Amino acid sequence: MKNKNENKEKNPLLLLKRLLSYIIKNYKLACFMVVVCILVSALTTLCGTLFIQKLIDNYIVPLTQMAVPDYSPLAQALLKLVAIFAVGVLCSYGYNRIMVNVGQGTMKKLRTEMFTNMESLPIRYFDTHAHGDIMSVYTNDIDTLRQLISQSIPQVLNSLITLVSTFVSMIVLDIPLTIVSVIMVAIMLFVTSKLSAASGRYFVEQQKDIGKVNAYIEEMMEGQKVVKVFCHEQESLEQFKQINNKLRESANNANKIANITMPINGNIGNISYVLCALVGGVLALSGFSGLTIGTLVAFLSLNKSFTQPVTEISQQVSSIVMAMAGAGRVFDLCDEVPETDEGDVELVNICYDSNGEIHETEEQTEMWAWKKPNAANKDEMYTRLQGDVTFDGVDFGYNPDKIVLHDIKMFAKPGQKLAFVGSTGAGKTTITNLINRFYDIQDGKIRYDGININHIKKDDLRRSLGIVLQDTNLFTGTIMDNIRYGRLNATDEECMAAAKLANADGFIKRLPDGYNTVLTGGGANLSQGQRQLLAIARAAVADPPVLILDEATSSIDTRTEKLVQRGMDALMTGRTSFVIAHRLSTVRNADCIMVMEQGRIIERGTHDQLMEEKGRYYQLYTGKSISA
């Protein structure tokens, strides 16, 4: 998926403009104070430099001509100079302190915006982007903005103010020497622009390569057991070396160009200083221009102040270019198009009055209905949530040009248990993903209690579904917190009841801290079966009318499977259930079994009916070949 600003925002100047606008929008007062402090700091530096002329011509030179020198005027002048520089130091401290706060605050806001937008992205986005690369945006890319905001931006602003004010002062002192200085600064700016353009594309590559390294490390950490089982440590290391070497090359290319910018400009600045000293010395000695010693010394100081900002800007170029590469990736994530949701039907709590009419209520009644805001009258506004699910001629493909489900037709009445069986890749899990609207179909309709699910708000649709995914995901926190994740307002007693229903209560109580046992690393301190039981308990506490069990017992041992199955049978009672299992014994009691092959339903019926037909289901169940 491409974001709406992908092409436009690759321009570094537009990225910088957007970032500056973002900072000013959120920190108007702080930015104003920073500009004032930088302005005062730059002017105090300039005043100090110009004061040197008066110090030499009006105080030091007259002292050399006095028989009895009076140093008190000189001392007073020096005190004024110290006061000027003290104000500059305080202002420098002030704007640096403020910019640190602005930088950290901006990074916090951007991380929050990225995370908020990321949570609204469709599942398809995460299918096509490496998780480690996304993590790199939150860490490496966002960190490139820290130095830009807290150091580079104020430094560049300070340098620009110094450059302009110094230029005006130089013109006042001596125009010929100013021309020499301007020519040398123009050369410095030309060199800086060429070198920064050359290094810019390498910094973009560097940030991408950092993301690839992070993605590979994250993948290897998740698959470390598989790596060790197949003894592929050396192969993994070699592959990492290739990715890491590519990062080294892009970083080396970027930094070797950026790092020579400052030395080159520094030497050009020194040449400018020497030329001004030579030309100024000749003019002063000839008496042609009326240059005094104080004016020449002051101008040479101004020359340093004129070339130094360009050198300082060139020093910040690498940080700015790298930050723009990072900012591009940050704004790319912020600009990713969220999951579309055009539904308007809501899931609401209801109660019945004495006349048997439905009324919406804020109380938790455990009775739910679909609310249609555009209904013609009140009788049609509410549809009781029952769990009736129908597929009518559904076609779907993860890519529009490659359909993986063909003309799927089925219905599940409230309380029925439907099972999907078939070989790997037949499309079983895909069907459950469509019920959740993790993906939208290409053709056909899916109806929930007679309502097209495209008309139901996605959040409300998903709240009505309980899900046990193929991969059990647990979060850092206590066991109680993980069970309560199914319904955040559930009480401890309700969570414990759900655990008992899932037959998880027994092993939980045997843990040292029981329900307060802290899980870390996705529940790595629990067995696979225990994690599966907690996932089932989490679905149970949500108390949904429809359950989706994707390979719920495919990864646990036979003994635990029997334990889970008893809990699941109790949980599925009275609920519409969609079950996917490779172990066909777990779905024998299903009301209807759908046999899938290459995205089509090729057989359907009860276990006994399908066994009598001796078709594909019979082959899967018995392991026997179908006789011709």
Describe the predicted segments one by one.
Residues 26, 30-40, 84, 90, ...:
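Transmembrane helices of ABC transporter permease
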Residues 62, 169-183, 253, 257-328, ...:
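Helix-loop-helix
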Residues 29-54, 77, 81, 95-100, ...:
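Alpha-helical segments in transporter systems
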Residues 1-45, 60-79, 95-99, 103, ...:
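Membrane-integrated ABC transporters
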Residues 6-12, 36, 44-60, 84-131, ...:
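Juxtamembrane helix-loop junctions of ABC transporter transmembrane domains
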Residues 25-28, 123-124, 142-149, 153, ...:
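An intracellular "coupling" helix at the cytosolic face of ABC transporter transmembrane type-1 domains
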